[in-house]
Amino acid sequence: MKYRRILLKLSGEALMGERPYGIDPEVLQSIASEVASVVRAGVQVAIVVGGGNIWRGRKEAAAQGMDQASADYVGMLATVINALTLQDAIERAGIPTRVQTAIAMQEVAEPYIRRRAIRHLEKGRVVIFGAGSGNPFFTTDTTAALRAAEIDAEVIFKATKVDGVYDADPKTHPQARRYDVLSYQDVLTRDLRVMDSTAIALCKENQLPIVVFDLTTPGNIYRVVQGEPIGTWIGQTTPKSNGIPARLAQESGS
């Protein structure tokens, strides 16, 4: 395998499948099976999961006139629901798993402790981080960047419903162009919104590459962790620099 330790960012929406709300059991089982195969290949896997399949903090706050901080706390609890569900699915796939939350809830999960999380990873356990960063006004993408830096992950894999980063929404713009390679600065200056600016800044500061890929294609989690050039690679360097993966550089025409 190309990587030793990774962080997988799953949006809550990714768990819905084609449902309008909640969790699709088939999608959950598929994700768990692929994560299990990656762990069996010797890769240490941490996961940050969102909660948008249950609660959309900013959207709900705006619609109901709810205080933003309160709405964000509800969203954090939604991520814990997803984390516990994902834990059960991965353990049924035969892989030991721990959930750590940024908000203490000792009856259902461990508190987030960096050194303990790293020790779990070293023992071959999947660690799922719930409750975001524990602070309102921060997204789960920012949490993913923060936790990846803290546990010394080599890369963040952001699983989405599209096969990379585009210059426009491919669902509404059929002529939208997909990028194979981007620098952090490209993402910020072009306002591509693959992650919020705080998350991108954290990744840039810690030189954490991001790979955005399509979760809906079976086997893609294993392929992308193996190093296959699928999706969009985002990093410190531009396509003409020496730091990007060679195959991606070839694809981008460098």
Curated annotation (Swiss-Prot):
Which domain of life does the protein's organism represent? Bacteria
> Is this entry keyworded rRNA processing?
no
| Catalytic activity, EC | 2.7.4.22
- Annotated residues that bind UMP are located at 51, 72, 133-140
Residue numbers binding ATP: 9-12, 52, 56, 160, 166, 169
What's in the keyword line of the UniProt record?
ATP-binding, Cytoplasm, Kinase, Nucleotide-binding, Pyrimidine biosynthesis, Transferase
Coiled-coil residues: none
**Per the record, what are the reactions this protein catalyses?**
UMP + ATP = UDP + ADP
- Gene Ontology annotations of biological process type: 'de novo' CTP biosynthetic process; UDP biosynthetic process
Q: In which pathway does it act?
A: Pyrimidine metabolism; CTP biosynthesis via de novo pathway; UDP from UMP (UMPK route): step 1/1
Example GO CC term: the record gives: cytoplasm
Molecular function terms, GO-annotated: ATP binding; UMP kinase activity
Q: What coarse category fits the chief subcellular location reported for this protein?
A: cytoplasm
The task this protein performs is described as: Catalyzes the reversible phosphorylation of UMP to UDP.
* Entry's family note: Belongs to the UMP kinase family.
Q: Tell me, how does this one assemble? A: Homohexamer.
Q: What is this protein called?
A: Uridylate kinase
Instruction: Name the gene behind this protein.
Output: pyrH
